[in-house]
Swiss-Prot record:
The gene is vapB11. Keywords: Toxin-antitoxin system. Antitoxin component of a type II toxin-antitoxin (TA) system. Upon expression in E.coli and M.smegmatis neutralizes the effect of cognate toxin VapC11. GO terms for biological process: detoxification; positive regulation of translation; response to host. It comes from Mycobacterium tuberculosis (strain ATCC 25618 / H37Rv). One of its GO terms (molecular function) is toxin sequestering activity. The keyword Metal-binding does not apply. This is Antitoxin VapB11.
Length: 72
């Protein structure tokens, strides 16, 4: 879905927010923090390992009901 391409862009970002993202996710650069934020916002393709990790989470529901066009 996404082509791997990079371009250099200068942006002004909130240093405190960048530092918090770096702290929470163990990142070492602001570039990595911005990349993570963009990928999470757009929605990265889910890895096989992530999907396998969801197995057995215990979700219970009615998929047919979720798929219907009926309002609650």
């Amino acid at each position: 879905m996404y082509r791997w391409c990079m371009s250099r862009t200068n942006i002004d970002i909130d240093d405190e927010l960048a530092a918090e993202v770096m702290r929470r996710f163990g990142l070492t650069t602001k570039r990595a923090a911005v990349d993570l934020a963009l990928r999470r916002l757009v929605g990265s393709p889910l890895s096989r390992e992530f999907l396998l990790g969801l197995e057995g989470v215990g979700w219970e529901g009615d998929l047919d009901d979720l798929r219907s066009d009926r309002p609650d």
